[in-house]
Structure formats: structure tokens, C-alpha cells
Amino acid sequence: QMCIRDRIYFDFSGYSDMAIGLGKMFGFEFNMNFNYPYVSKSITEFWRRWHISLSSWFRDYVYIPLGGNRVSKIKHIRNLLIVWFLTGLWHGAAWNFVAWGLYYGVILIIEKYLLSPVLDRLPDVVRHIYSIVLVVIGWVLFFSSSFGQAADYIRVMFGAGAHGFADRESMYLLTSNLILWLILIFGSTPLVHFRYEHMLRSKKWNTTIINSVVYAALFIVCIAYLVTETYNPFLYFRF
């Protein structure tokens, strides 16, 4: 499930960035759609960083017209449940998408009215683990075809499956691709971006040459992968 977590992030964030880049080529400026969501320390923060365009649309055209948070507690809870029910339904008229949306709606309500003071007192690493675990469970609901399948995945995640946390095949695949997985985890954090920006701001480096070399290298690598790949559509193209 951690691999699914990374796949959907790089899949969706990747083609969102491609759209932003293509827009720039034609003189259009598009807002960032993903802001390193997997560094979040709460689900509330996660949804400020994940699929920002969708969250902003539902906020502006559904949540605020319903009264937003300028209403009573009961009505605010109602507003959140309506927004997240519709967010799930936006992805498809299937139980798993609706359950996924309501799952996040309930968590956001609990964080707002119960957990927020508790989370604020916890160490950052604990809050981060809390966020990642809930997000991964969310992806289980999103991709499962039945409640039974979702329950089986969640049991295995917590070591309650027939083979514990993973069977031999899963462990083989994990160890065989461990370096790639670590690169993906590292790439989903802002560390590379911050380091690159720091280097560009340093007077020791010629930013024009650095940008040209980096972009050319990335372009060559991308073309090489495209040439060797078969047809592999983006996961989010169906939404």
C-alpha cells in the first residue's frame, strides 16, 4: 500500500506538473496542484496540500455557499459531510469513492473538534506517522472493489494477515526495489527542491548553466523512458 501511495502521488502530481509546464509554454500560469502532501502532520494539512484545485473548487462553490464554518457546530459538520460526500462522488458513482470521501469527512470533523489540541502536543514524527497511516488506509478504500477486500488489505497492513505484514513474494519485490522506493520517498519530500533552490541562490554557481544542464539531463532521461515504455495511461485519467 505504501507503493500505491507513491504511485498515485507521482502519477497525478506528475501530469499536473506537465500541464503547468505546457501552460507556461503557451503563456498561461496555473497554480500548484500538489505541495508535498506526504510531509503533512495531520489530515487537515494533507488536504491543504493534495489536489489543491479540486479542494479549492469545492470550497468556493459548495462549502462556502452552504455557510462554511460561519454556522453552528451541527451545520458545520453537515457542510463538511456534504462536501466530502460530493468529493467522493466526483471520482465516480461507486461505493468505494463515496466511502473514501466520507472517510476523510469524518476524520476532518474529528480533527477539528476533538484531535486538534492533542495533535498539537505530539512530536512531529508521531503526527507524521499518524497522517501517513490514515492516508494509506484511505487509498485502500479508494482502490478496493468491496468492503471485504478493503478489510483484508487493512488487516495485512497491521500484521493480522495469514503471512504477517508480507509474504515471501512481497518481501522479494520490496528488497529488489528498495533503492527505487527510497528514491521515491525522498522525492516526495521538499528536500531536493529546497537544496536545489539554495544552490541557485548561492553566488558560487552560475544559475543559467545549472538550470540548462539539469533540464537537459531530465529531458533526456524522460525521453529514454518514454521510448522503452509500453502504453501506460495515467491512473487519474478516468476522473
Regions found by a protein language model. Give the residues of each.
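Membrane-embedded transmembrane alpha-helical bundles that form the catalytic cores
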Residues: Q1, R5-R238
